[in-house]
Amino acid sequence: MHHRMNEMNLSPVGMEQLTSSSVSNALPVSGSHLGLAASPTHSAIPAPGLPVAIPNLGPSLSSLPSALSLMLPMGIGDRGVMCGLPERNYTLPPPPYPHLESSYFRTILPGILSYLADRPPPQYIHPNSINVDGNTALSITNNASALDPYQSNGNVGLEPGIVSIDSRSVNTHGAQSLHPSDGHEVALDTAITMENVSRVTSPISTDGMAEELTMDGVAGEHSQIPNGSRSHEPLSVDSVSNNLAADAVGHGGVIPMHGNGLELPVVMETDHIASRVNGMSDSALSDSIHTVAMSTNSVSVALSTSHNLASLESVSLHEVGLSLEPVAVSSITQEVAMGTGHVDVSSDSLSFVPPSLQMEDSNSNKENMATLFTIWCTLCDRAYPSDCPEHGPVTFVPDTPIESRARLSLPKQLVLRQSIVGAEVGVWTGETIPVRTCFGPLIGQQSHSMEVAEWTDKAVNHIWKIYHNGVLEFCIITADENECNWMMFVRKARNREEQNLVAYPHDGKIFFCTSQDIPPENELLFYYSRDYAQQIGVPEHPDVHLCNCGKECNSYTEFKAHLTSHIHNHLPTQGHSGSHGPSHSKERKWKCSMCPQAFISPSKLHVHFMGHMGMKPHKCDFCSKAFSDPSNLRTHLKIHTGQKNYRCTLCDKSFTQKAHLESHMVIHTGEKNLKCDYCDKLFMRRQDLKQHVLIHTQERQIKCPKCDKLFLRTNHLKKHLNSHEGKRDYVCEKCTKAYLTKYHLTRHLKTCKGPTSSSSAPEEEEEDDSEEEDLADSVGTEDCRINSAVYSADESLSAHK
């Protein structure tokens, strides 16, 4: 193959022509240009594609402030060779330049498209220095942080660059091994340096010559030659005519490309130079500069805008496992097409996997820049991923903290301090607060899906239940300071002495009202009003839990544990078993110390004790009734749902409870199988038996002042007095009959069919009288008018009649 040496004209104003002297008896080194010295006119390009020549950089090459460093990919592994484009100057802004995260082809393509559109090329930004040094083993380490793409001083130029490819030979076919025919081993040594430049020169020939992108190499010794004693030969760029034979490509390794001159303003960025070979520094590059020993054989890499890759074959360096693939850039799709050649992998070689490169858009490029560089130094006028290495970290001034809504809404008469009840924050008075001073309403997050069972800890006032007509409507949650006002910090009193606020609901809101004059330096402590405490099922007073034995408990857990000590685990006496049978005496062995009732389990006894203490935590959602036993609540809910699963087999009546059905069946059978444990009397209904047992067990008796009847409860006596006074407040709307209690009126309405005749009126009145007697828990005696038998209860007398 014929080679023609051309001089490389990098001639900005006041710059001499570049030459390089030989080292170790080597030929002088000179660069070639891309055509004529004059700048080309913007004419149409007849042929799609134009090669770019890569000149050799001589050993005496000094700093060039107006030369452009061009890195072309040497394969799929982001390695390349530098070249200079002479005679075409484009002014670049002074350094430093912001770093752009983009691919190599992303930056070279706009220059090509700008020329095709008859527009001046855009300005490009170049890294400061990229050093890649390699040996036969190609020990590459990914150290992107060590590559500083900026130049701190104002000297912009091309530092001494090296393109050294030692001991290499190219055979006639690109896919064959590139080692010499004499059989000795091939060593590859490469060193590349990139520098920022301020001007670009690119004269292109117009005489119809086809330019080649050519790299020539020869075989050398296996051992690495020292930098000072290395032999050098020129690296030349050949130009061939348009009618170059096709076999010249195969034998010479040169890829011809036809067409007029094409400007290639090129940008090289560090994101595709992620690999760096250790062992060579900038000082080493300045001290020892060596070139390449080349032969007539050549390795060619072509770059074109639209090139047929079918005629290109991959060139493989088998000794180091590096494959040079033909690369084409499409100006239409803006995609990079890689060759389909494979990479030769050996045990002692570095393998490069062909990537599929995709052009990035401008938006993603900006996002990458924002992710990588977060700190902007105004003195350096550039961005850094962390603190500036020269000026250090910047000074940040934080915003003034904004307090929460709860703290900002605190009245000026109050302050926030440590609470005395154990909470973190409490509300204290700064001045005297008079009695009947109201605060509110309480502001918080409303929740309509809050279940009753979820509020298990009654001591924590983070959830406030709001009822409407006895039904839970919603809850106010006071857990977030940004959603609540200052009232969320008011704590609950532990006893009556601490309480100075009363919390009560009004119109779906919670208000606090002072119950006494509160002097300064006192904490606001609330407790619920009587009605609200009944609604939510808590004690009406915040006193400590006091047992009948005199023991004071500060918490319900302590009180519950104390009640266990009162449980007497003993069997009832044989005389008290009576007709209940042995099964009852064995099952009900847990007796209450406050009443004669016994239970089959200690848990039932605990629930029973809660009834003695007035604690009813289980509240009905449909009405205001509360229960100490959850089973009673479940039974009560059947009243609202109308569920009656127990039906009488002898009539059409149905009942919500099994016990009610059993009591009803006695009416049909007439059996008296319930016997008193203290006497021999028998009863049909369990309710009658309980009423009778009170005669033997209850000591306190209330006597009617108008008659000799005795009563166990005051409310029963009041109802009895109404019978003496003739007060019947419950009137039937159908027949105008009146009754003492609502219960009797309800029972009458089930059978009332309207106004009754006069003959049946006395009978109905007699029934009413007997019903009135049922209300009295009397322990007195009644004489039968038929005989002299004496009965202790009215119902027993009625049954006797």
Curated annotation (Swiss-Prot):
EC number: 2.1.1.-
Keyword Transmembrane found: no
Enzyme class: transferase
PROSITE patterns: SET (PS50280), ZINC_FINGER_C2H2_1 (PS00028), ZINC_FINGER_C2H2_2 (PS50157)
Alphabetically ordered keywords of this record: DNA-binding, Metal-binding, Methyltransferase, Nucleus, Repeat, S-adenosyl-L-methionine, Transcription, Transcription regulation, Transferase, Zinc, Zinc-finger
Assigned protein family: Belongs to the class V-like SAM-binding methyltransferase superfamily.
Protein name listed in UniProt: PR domain zinc finger protein 4
Source organism (scientific name): Pongo abelii
Lineage: Eukaryota, Metazoa, Chordata, Craniata, Vertebrata
